[in-house]
Amino acid sequence: IITTVALKVAGMSWFMAMNLALASVATGGFSYQYESLMEFETVYVEMIVIIAMVAASLNFALYYKIYQHNFKVFWIDTERKAYFWIIGIATFLITWNLYYTGYFDAATSFRHALFQTVSIASTTGFASSDFNLWPDFSRYVLLLLMFVGGCSGSTAGGMKVSRFVILLKVTWAELRRTIHPRLVYSIKMGGRNVPPVVVGNVTRLSLIHISEPTRR
């Protein structure tokens, strides 16, 4: 409802606003416009959709904690912080690449980089620009975002950020163990130890998720 009203205030019709709001919150990316959000060419609509996509791709359990006035859990949540870092780093890299190659000016590069990063990371799929024509580096970054996806417990797809974080921690721990063979390590998420069984399952599932497109 909030997203629909905000889009209406931004100048859209009620039907278009409701259609876009439902697709954004569901991270479905459905749009009856042939060119997706490229048809609107307005920063206000893009910013509203970005906020909706980010909100929908976070763990919904965090909102329940906020409802209980437990704001600390939201701020210290490892997955949320990792997700925001991923969005920030990817946006910076794509902005730099688009500007450096002369594809857009600085402001426009940041605008489209942020929108496409959030759209792909949340597995929504909206487009504010035809990123298929972007430089190869930017498209590779978007491809990696597609694999990682959004947070667990959200409407987003992908491997999930929590599994990606665990996979990175396991990789780092194994690299350290090559230097210190007797090293005993434990994987932690949110200050709690992740059971070895869960770590093993996450590792196997992540490898299957990554290798499946290649096998096809």
Would you name each region that the model predicts?
Residues 1-216:
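Membrane-proximal intracellular helices of multi-pass ion channels
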